[in-house]
């Protein structure tokens, strides 16, 4: 089968369905993630909570660090590039990452344009707050969508809101006639065929993971119950006091999200003193909210 085709890209993304992708910053963390059952790791210089705290410009991770992690784990390795930064994406593809996240967690390089992801053989994942954003990213070639949430906060509320918005807007599409779907395609700025496909399927044509503020096993179970195909965990694991236990618990809760007894068991001894502290969304100034980057 030819590499880099839409079928291959989306097929790879579907292989991760039901799993947890964990943010890591070094080999030790990557090995913890792999041992805990993560389906992939996302390599960055700092986890989102530290990016938020440090301020300044957040860029692609050092390629040497990514390659080092690739040499030490057997699961897929992803990495983030800045929104619109084609050269960073080219570097990541050149070193052989398995997927690129064109991410609002990093400082956008282009305030008006995202990367044309069709020009790459490596699959991309992108964030979305609503159906319009999701469809625009898919039209650009994204093989996976994730909620934006509000990364680095340990607060799942925005991820919940974004997942509910996307589900509601998809449900509304399924009730529209052809002329109304043409109107929606124009409103969203995407091809009619893509809107019609979503209306017919009753879901996105790619997998839709939850991300942004997931900090506990119960958070992961909640997002799966809301229809997520899988989970991205950023700061929630390695900002906790017991990373290994938290990683294993979130993997278990994601797999058995519909079994409260399992979620309860893996959540034991992972209370506020263990989970990351978290931020209240309303206390974050609008200009510091990562989710507002890249509409």
Swiss-Prot record:
CDD domains: pdxS. The active site is at residue 80. Pathway: Cofactor biosynthesis; pyridoxal 5'-phosphate biosynthesis. Keywords: Lyase, Pyridoxal phosphate, Schiff base. D-glyceraldehyde 3-phosphate binds at residue 164. Its EC number is 4.3.3.6. Disulfide bonds: none annotated. One of its GO terms (molecular function) is pyridoxal 5'-phosphate synthase (glutamine hydrolysing) activity. In the presence of PdxT, forms a dodecamer of heterodimers. This is Pyridoxal 5'-phosphate synthase subunit PdxS. It comes from Methanopyrus kandleri (strain AV19 / DSM 6324 / JCM 9639 / NBRC 100938). The gene is pdxS.
């Amino acid at each position: 089968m030819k590499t880099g085709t839409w079928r291959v890209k989306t097929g790879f993304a579907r292989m991760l369905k039901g799993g947890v992708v964990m943010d890591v910053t070094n080999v030790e963390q990557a090995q913890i993630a792999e041992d805990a059952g993560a389906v992939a790791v996302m390599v960055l210089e700092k986890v989102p909570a530290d990016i938020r705290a440090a301020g300044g410009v957040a860029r692609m991770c050092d390629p040497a660090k990514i390659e080092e992690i690739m040499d030490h784990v057997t699961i897929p390795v992803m990495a983030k590039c800045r929104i619109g930064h084609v050269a960073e994406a080219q570097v990541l593809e050149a070193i052989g990452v398995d997927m690129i996240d064109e991410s609002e967690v990093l400082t956008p390089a282009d305030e008006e344009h995202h990367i044309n992801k069709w020009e790459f053989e490596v699959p991309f994942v992108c964030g979305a707050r609503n159906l319009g954003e999701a469809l625009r990213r898919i039209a650009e070639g994204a093989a996976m969508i994730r909620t934006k949430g509000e990364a680095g906060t340990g607060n799942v509320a925005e991820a919940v809101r974004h997942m509910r918005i996307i589900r509601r807007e998809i449900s509304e599409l399924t009730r529209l006639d052809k002329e109304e779907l043409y109107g929606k395609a124009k409103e969203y700025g995407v091809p009619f065929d893509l809107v019609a496909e979503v209306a017919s399927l009753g879901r996105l044509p790619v997998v839709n993971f939850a991300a942004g503020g997931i900090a506990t096993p119960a958070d992961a179970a909640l997002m799966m119950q809301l229809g997520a195909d899988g989970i991205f965990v950023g700061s929630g694991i390695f900002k906790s006091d017991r990373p290994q236990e938290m990683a294993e618990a979130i993997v278990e809760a994601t797999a058995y999200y519909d079994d409260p007894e399992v979620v309860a068991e893996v959540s034991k001894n992972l209370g506020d003193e263990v989970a990351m502290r978290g931020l209240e969304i309303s206390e974050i100034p609008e200009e510091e909210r990562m989710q507002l980057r890249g509409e």
